[in-house]
Amino acid sequence: MTPPDKKTAARKAPRKKAAPKGPGREELQFTIDSAWERRTMLTVDEIDGSTRPMVNLVMDRIESGEYRVAEPDGKGGWKVNEWLKKAVLLYFRTQDMELVEADPAPFWDKVPARFRDFDEARFRKLGVRVVPGAIARRGSHLGKDVVLMPSFVNIGAYVGEGTMVDTWATVGSCAQVGKHCHLSGGAGIGGVLEPLQATPTIIEDHCFIGARSEVVEGFVVGHHAHLQPHDG
């Protein structure tokens, strides 16, 4: 048996506090909205001191799926989180051009690759299959069991778990693709950043988008839909 004094000590031992998760949603939104209003007047010190770190934190949370540029409103529709679009646009304003190493030739861009600095452990944790030739940019969310064939997923996009992005398919900036969808070869899911209030292209769960189909910004493809390009 544990002596009484040890039991008392155990009861009184302070619990370890969880590590802080950083600024909350409201603080981030306020910072992003404020920076957006002053975007043409931001100083170097402001960008380095608060704007860029906050924008990068938002990008991290978009990548994790915690934040989405558009999300279900609980009434059968969708709502657009304009402040997240602002964050994506501010990302371009606050990042410097940099050399992106690649083979056979490097790139010169502001947006790094989603998988830059990944190793085997990080790929296994993410749970996404990435075929050679696939490109996903920083700030894109990829759910578990997503398969990326040689395709392109842009910044701010959301691709739900179990979805196949087939060869030469494109998921545009801030587009939202649901779970267990199939974007066939050459399909294009349009991207939209401006105007801010515009609804991104949305593909709901369990959809099949046929080869060479194009779904432009503002359209919502309902769940379990099957689209083929018009041949007439």
Language-model features: locations:
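Terminal amphipathic alpha-helical/low-complexity segments used for targeting or macromolecular assembly
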Residues: 1-128
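Structural signal for interior beta-strand "rungs" in well-ordered beta-sheet cores
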Residues: 124, 128-232
